[in-house]
Amino acid sequence: MDLLAKASVLLLLLLSLSNAQTDNMEEAENGSSKEEIDESELEDVSSIIFRMNNNSMEELLEGDLVLPKTRNAMKCFGAPDSCRWPKSSNGIVKVPYVVSDNYESDEKETIRNAMKEFAEKTCIHFVPRNNERAYLSLEPRFGCKSMMGYVGDKQVVVLQRFGCIKHAVIQHELLHALGFYHEHTRSDRDQHVKINWENIIKDFTHNFDKNDTDNLGTPYDYGSIMHYGRTAFGKDRKETITPIPNPKAAIGQTERMSDIDILRVNKLYKC
């Protein structure tokens, strides 16, 4: 190989290395690479919530429901109809809220966007609080959790930063605050899913107890944002919930409220 040919090969090698380095620098600036995928984007809502609530010192029902501390608040666990937020004379259900200043501006925007979808598709309007006694206080404490339904006073919706500030997770916790249970605890769930009790971690079997629910004449919804994922509270990630009759049916949600979730809000609040 003559000198000119060797120089040409060397130049091609240098150009190739330069392009590769440029690609790597661009990936570093963007904070990701082609091989890297945010694992949380692949998780269903319940998996994200349980991961964020892991090691919580607070006793939680069904993984993310804060147990009421007053007799008045207990009513929602016995009679869901009695824990609805009050409706205005114009048919709008106004839910006052405050968002902690400990969130960044983009996190606040994500929260408000999740709330906005309720106003677009239901009669639920989350409105900034003035001086109302009953309101939601969204705070970045440990985990993702909420109380169940209308309490009549300040009630905290916990949305930890760097994990819970996701459209679907926010809507999940807001639905709890509006009075909705997890889908797999429906009174008719045994017709639609099989609970694999032997695969559930011993201390968490109570999270799969059925509730005496009013299903509002709506079908069981595998795609509900309130549905547990297949391996929720499973030993070594074993399957704890199996759809029937089709065991391969997709369950869980990763993006937003399903159409049936929205239908139920409209039915419960007579929108």
Swiss-Prot record:
Zn(2+) binds at residues 172, 176, 182. It comes from the Eukaryota. In medaka the hatching enzyme system is composed of two distinct proteases, the high choriolytic enzyme (HCE), of which there are two isoforms, and the low choriolytic enzyme (LCE). It catalyses: Hydrolysis of the inner layer of fish egg envelope. Also hydrolysis of casein and small molecule substrates such as succinyl-Leu-Leu-Val-Tyr-|-7-(4-methyl)coumarylamide. The keyword Zinc applies. This is Low choriolytic enzyme. One of its GO terms (molecular function) is zinc ion binding. It comes from Oryzias latipes (Japanese rice fish). SMART domains: ZnMc. Residues 21-71 form a propeptide. Binds 1 zinc ion per subunit. Disulfide bonds join 76-83, 123-271, 144-164. Participates in the breakdown of the egg envelope, which is derived from the egg extracellular matrix, at the time of hatching. Thus allowing the newly hatched fish to swim free. LCE solubilizes the egg envelope only after it has been swollen by the action of HCE. Keywords: Cytoplasmic vesicle, Disulfide bond, Glycoprotein, Hydrolase, Metal-binding, Metalloprotease, Protease, Signal, Zinc, Zymogen. InterPro entries: MetalloPept_cat_dom_sf, Peptidase_M12A, Peptidase_Metallo, ZnMP_hatching_enz. Residues 1-20 form the signal peptide. One of its GO terms (cellular component) is zymogen granule. Its main location: other.
